[in-house]
Structures are given as C-alpha cells and as structure tokens.
Amino acid sequence: MPATALLPEPAAERVLPTLNQDGTRRWLRPKLSRGRFFRRRRGLAWVLIALFALIPYLRMNGKPLILLDVVRRQFTLFGTTFLPTDTVLLMLLLVGIFLAIFWLTAVYGRVWCGWACPQTVYMEFLYRPIERLIEGGSRAQSDLDRRGWALRRLVKHAVFVGLSMFLAHTFLAYFVGVEELRRWVTRSPVEHPAAFLVMATTTALMFLDFGWFREQVCMVACPYGRLQSVLLDRRSLIVGYDAQRGEPRGTHRDRRASRDDLAATRAGDSPGARVMVTGDSPGAVAFGDCIDCGACVVTCPTGIDIRQGLQMECIHCTQCMDACDAVMDRIGRPPGLIRYSSKDQLQGEPGRILRPRVVVYPLLVLLVWGALGVALAHRAPAEITVLRGLGSPFTLLPSGDVSNQLRVKIVNRGSEERHYRIQLAEDAILRLVAPDTPLPVGGGKSATATVFVIAPRSAFVHGQRDIRLHVEDEAGFGAATPYRLMGPSQ
C-alpha cells in the first residue's frame, strides 16, 4: 500500500479523495484532532458501542427489543412483532422512518453520519484507535505504507480479525436472536456448517469493510451522501468554512513577507512595491484568518478540503472544526473559522428557522406515526383467514347433504401459545366437523385447520350460502369471519 501525500489533488482533477489520478488507491491516514467536539463524539460513541452490543439481549413485553428474523419473516421492534401479512403496518413504519430521516437531515444536516452511524462509530472510535495504538500516528502509518508489510501491520490485522469476529456475532444477533447465536457458538461448526459459513462470511465482510474499504463506504456505497443534494437546503445545518472571514489565505511566510515589503516601501527602499498587510493600513490588502496550514485537510477522515465548500464526501464529523479551532487559538484569533452553520449564514444572509420542509416533514411524521399507533392499537391478537379446500368446491354425500371443505389459517400475533376453537355462528341447519379443534398455535406462529361444513341441499340459493365462522381462544379473543359456501343449484 504505497503512501501518498495527504493533501488532496486539485478539485478539477480529483474524482474521489481516495483515488489518485491514475486510478490507484490513495490511502488516507488522517491526523487525530483532539478538540471539544471530538471529546463529545467519543463519549457518545462509547455509549453507542455499548448500546449496539446490548440491544440484542434487551427484552420488552417478553420479546427481544429488536429482532429482524428474516428466515421466519418476523420483525420485532420495541416488543412489537410485525408479520409478513402486516403490509400496511410495515409500510407506515418504513415511511415514518424515512420521513424522520428527511426531517433530521433538513434541520441538522448529516449529524447522523458524523455522530451516530455505526460505520463512523466503529471506524473512528474502535478500529482507528487500535490502528494508532499499534502503528503510531498518521506519519508513522505513512512510513509503514512506504516500507510495505511489517510485524506491526500483521499484528494490527490479526487484532482486526478478532474484532471483526466479535462485531459479526453482534450483528448476527440482530437477525437470529441471542439464543440461536449461543447455540451456534457452543456447538461444533460441523453440526451447523451453514451457520458457520454465515458467521465466517460476515466476519470477512466486517474485516473487508473496516480494514480495507473504510471511508469509501460513505463515499461510494452509502446513498445517504448522494441524497443530501435534495434533502438539504441553504438553511440546513452544515459544517462549513467561513470564506468571508478566512479569505484571502496567507501563510505565516506570506504575512511576514508582506510586512517586510510594506516597511521597505514606506522607507523608500522599494518604490512601487505591492503593499499587503494584515492590519487595517490605508490602501493595504489584508489577509484573512486562514493561514493555509492544511490542518483541516490532514485531519479529515474522508480526505476532503472543507474550504472548497459543501461536498458529498463530508460526513460532518467536526474533525476539521477541532483542528482549525486549535490553530486559531495558537495564533490568537477567535475560533469558529470552520463551524456549524448554514450556507446562508456563511454568506452573511439571515437564517430562517421556519421554512416549508421544516414544517411539512414533522407534520407528515406525526401523521404517519399517529396512523401507525392507531393501527397497532386496533390490531387483533390473531389473524384469521378462511380458504377454500383443495379439489372440488363441494362434495355430494351419500346422504344427499353437501360438504364444503375449508382451511382456516390462524396467525397468533402474541408471544404465548393459544388454543383456538372453531365454531359456526348461529346456523341451526348447518353442521361443522372440525377434527383439529381446538387448534394449538405457538406465539408468533401460524397453523391451519381443516374443517368441513355440511348442509342440506335446500340450504343453498342459486348454489350459494353465506355463513360466519367464529374463532375464539381461552384468553378471550373472538372473531367472526364471513365465508360463502358452494353447493348445487336448485
């Protein structure tokens, strides 16, 4: 992995911060800036890392707090289980989540990316600290890049593999549950080769992500950054460079040279020389506060120059803010040359808190989440579906009666097993034969009972008769489902 300079190529020639002009990988070794925002992010990251690991073990209403059981097609969120038949509920849930993301982005920009996204949290507060601990700072890492593979780098990757294995198990716990994961871990891989293959593949993907692909996930794979052009407006919160305060840039050497030139000009030693000073002398061209030190560039984990304006690659991690504030403090200038602001405010225009999308998005979020809450409150503890039996629609019995075979599918939405009894609702001339009743159905599972409804030929009008099947359990649930029997025409 050959190292290249951390300073970016000119914007007109650069495709991605992680690519050189010839298309080869440009490895980023960002310098850590320990400022006030970094300390806040680090504290939040430690809480999130612990929370991400604990969530699969937490339970609510007797169910996992979050379990995305793809195999059984059941999604449990905050103690509520969504089944494949809950199409409307799932639609409301997803729409509500996306609208909440749109609202958050419109108001606070990409605060999720820089502060709470698992990719950023694990990369910047788990993998990079371990990398710095083993290989050293950004300069030492660049030296290792030039030297090629070394023992330190082998040790780092070995630690990365172990860490990726732990994260893979944590990740899989969200999809298979901690009980199933415990069985995988305590049994030999020979007994469950498919599960072992899933774990090994997930570990490899984790290692590939955090050990090799790294910041390119945010720039190439994640669509969120590309959506910011439509999710943000000129008044959204961003990490921005105050060009009005910082320009024109000038290094310490430029500033010293300008002072020397001015002194020489005033002394008459250099008639007609260009006068540039940092003060407010009449006729002088003053430098801005930016000393063009590049600290904001070498500390950026995605390799951009924030002074070029808002960019897709910026994840609002605030590292450039901490780096710039430290420089401003050293040169005796006020902090905030790079700060949280909006495009309008950075250009000297007044900011507006209330604007259409900031009003419309929360109203839509309240509407959708309110509809979801009402739907969940009125959702029955079981779902009953009556289907026609296989084969002919009806059968003529030797006694002259007509038999209809029905299949009653019962989905138990609760967490405990229930026993369901199937009956005919108030129809004296019909008879129900239900060999499978009461039907036991486990929590979160479904079962189908086959029943027969026997009726005399005289019960049918134009070959049809409407009935109602009543299904109830021992916990007090009861539901009547309409159904139309088929029979011979009179």
Question: Locations of the language-model features?
Answer:
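Asparagine-centered strand-capping/turn motif at beta-strand->loop junctions
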Residues: I410-G414
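Short, hydrophobic/aromatic beta-strand segments
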Residues: E416-L424, Q464, T481
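Terminal connector regions
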Residues: A455-Q490
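Cysteine-centered iron-sulfur cluster-binding motifs in ferredoxin-type domains/subunits
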Residues: T105-T120, F210-G225, E247-G250, D280-M328
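Membrane-embedded alpha-helical bundles of multi-pass integral membrane proteins
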Residues: M1-T265, G272-A273, P334-L366
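Intrinsically disordered, low-complexity Pro/Gly/Ser/Thr-rich segments with frequent PxxP/GP/PP motifs
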Residues: L432-S458
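Short, solvent-exposed loop/linker segments at beta-strand-coil boundaries, enriched for Pro/Gly
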Residues: E426-L432
